[in-house]
Amino acid sequence: MHTLGGKKVLLGISGSIAAYKAPLLVRLLIKKGAEVKVVLTPSAMDFVTPTTLSTLSKNPVNTSFTEIKDEQDNPEWNNHVELSLWADFIIIAPATSNTISSMASARCDNLLLACYLSAKCPVFVAPSMDLDMYKHPGNQENLNKLKSFGNIILESESGDLASGLNGKGRMMEPKNIIKYLIKDLKNELPLKGKKILISAGPTYEKIDPVRFIGNFSSGKMGFSLAEAATNLGA
């Protein structure tokens, strides 16, 4: 079952080395049934190309407020409000310290920040930076400020960093972002809080101590029902 089926996701990518994980995140979102549109900051294009992301998302990638979209080289305005209203939720991954600071102070000097400020949907933020940058009081203050706005912080993970250090600051892995989204989505699902008992596999009914009546059920139907119920919040 497509656990994100029909959901519209606006993925914002800022200029971090972790941007190389963005194509995988796009693929996982689509695999789960979501429709994905991508917004790149100018610095993000130093790490990942619009061509890659448009190929995977099957949608044009937005990089600036205006883009050339016709043969006469006439610039066309990218409507950030329209993009934000289209989305069921926004994911900013990776979110650099600079982007987080801009979001916290309501700056609007690129298309991604304009989309963020126009958002009426849940916004998920996945910080990505070096260990000491992540721990800096100013950055922590900005993250707490975003939380106070109602944004959801996808906590950075610990591990090897691009600087060679080891510690907290890595962007949450794409597979874990997907798990978090699905878990959050379950709060809206129709079977949330319901307990369902499903039997699966072959059954045997004794005739006597030696013989029985049975079947060759594989249990696949029961397992599929259990998976579907789980995906609906049970």
Regions found by a protein language model. Give the residues of each.
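A cross-family phosphate/adenosyl-ligand binding-site feature
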Residues: 1-124, 130-219, 223-234
